Amino acid sequence: SSNKADPMTMGTNGVINSAKEMTLVYLPHLTAGSVSSSMINQFASAARNKVAAVNIDYAVDSSNNEVTVTHSYVDEQGAAVDTIAGMHPLHWKNASQATTPYQIRSARGTIKFAELSQFSYQIPYVGVLPTLPSIDGSFNQATLAGLVTDFVNQGSNVWNTSADGDLYEDTYWSGKNYGKVAEVSAIARSIGMTAEANDMIDWLKAELSDWFSSEADGVLKTKKYFVYDSDWNTLLGFDEAYGSHQRLADHHFHYGYFVRAAAEICRVDLAWCGQDQYGPMIELLIRDYAADKDDPMFPHMRNFDPANGFSWADGKMNFIRGNNNESTSEAATAYGAIILYGLATDNTELTEKGMYLHASTGATYWEYWNNIDGYNNVSAESNNFFPGYAHITTSIIWGDGVDFATWFSGAFAHILGIQGLPSSPLIFHVGLHADYMEDYVNLGLSESSNNKPSGLVDDQWRDLWWNLWAMTDAQAAIADYNSVSSYVPEQGESKAHTYHWIHTFDELGHLATGTGEITTNHPAAIAFDKNGVKSYVVYNFTDQTIPVTFKQGNTVIHTMNATPFGFTVE
């Protein structure tokens, strides 16, 4: 309707267009008094431009791995529609799109309104590696070999058991342990313990092939298998955990662990992931949580929300506060696993899909979980947390806001530590801002008896905190690690991995790629900075030497030739 009503004076208005339709608009008015006529006129000008759909697409620039995300507003015929769109902080902070003077606060922060038919924004890609490299002189070889041997000598019968010795047969805890074994296997192989690495890979093959088969000895199984449910368009793994059946919750977490373990198998035995072996089953798991728009079996990007740029955990989302998401690191693991699998199998489409999901997960972690602009006092409108929020971070994002909590504990070590599990080179996004990380670690350890991981009580993830601390101050993490003679690893972590992680970060320094300042043209390439000295790490999944370039802005700062099937560190 062309009628305009002031809601403060109300009044009666008729619908006077031929369609007998009207558009109701909540105007973004933040101050007391009447809404300005200029605001009313601007919104009225687009009020009858009917938007039937918003198409969200991504593209990866292979020259610098920058990801561009485009929101397009279309009518029922698919033609572009001029409208006034609300741009969330992730959008307007990373776009060149001009906005109107009108804005409003939301659960995510300031929404700015813009006249447009589409907008695009750019986010940096963080990068992944199959494991951290083993660099001569960065650790004691005998110590690391001993920790790998200790893990192997436990026996494979305990690799997928709880601390009490109970065997796991659900998708979450089994997947978590498969990821752990994949990490130890990769470390073992990197230091020449090939026999031990192969033993772990053989165990992973047996475990995953068991899950990927519905029968045992000609009889249908009741545990450790997947089935497709056509009513709900989903793949269900038996046994379920944490509502993965009843609520279709956390599929990206659970199945991402399986894909991560499978990707390590593919890295060392590509034939096992062939289309005539287990490749189709691995890709079916990926499709369940990261399907294309036109997938006939699964919803588009089940857990990932392209509009917000991050993932939601729950499938039912019938909470009063809407949906929620806790661990960005488990989401990043799921999406990073797609990248590793895509690189190992030379599947560019999957690799770039994983890069988009992984980059967006990292960008939104810093935008919404850590409110990095608020932390840096950029401006009032850039501060996404509501006035009076007492912390520099949050653990749970809800539809209506944030919550400094976890689902299982009120301990600060858990509330902040959950963003550091599982610890692997798929979660580098958590360590991007080393200065911020100092305050993050201090807050997470503020309830420790000595403000260090060694002072945490049992089951508060000492090892994960050493790993997080190493991303900002590796020498301090190592010193505290060396003060502890015995500890129980977090369920998805191993002593070999922790030792390797903290000493490798001590050698390499802080992450230097991932914020957009330094970029590279390879998905498995990372730059580090230690006291102003750069190190460049590349893993080449192919059988050919490949050139890799690192840039600062448009200036090339390093080029290297990455050797086939392995790490190159310069």
Can you annotate each of these PLM segments?
Residues 168-189, 204, 245-274, 278-282, ...:
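Aromatic-rich carbohydrate-recognition surfaces in CAZymes
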Residues 1-252, 292-310, 314-315, 342-345, ...:
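Ser/Thr/Asn(+Pro)-rich, low-complexity disordered segments
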Residues 319, 324, 329-343, 351:
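Alpha-helical transmembrane segments
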Residues 273-283, 287-303, 340:
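Alpha-helical scaffolds that organize eukaryotic protein assemblies
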Residues 258, 285, 350, 354-357:
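Alpha-helical solenoid repeat scaffolds, predominantly canonical TPR units
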Residues 271-274, 347-351:
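Acidic, serine/threonine/proline-rich low-complexity intrinsically disordered regions
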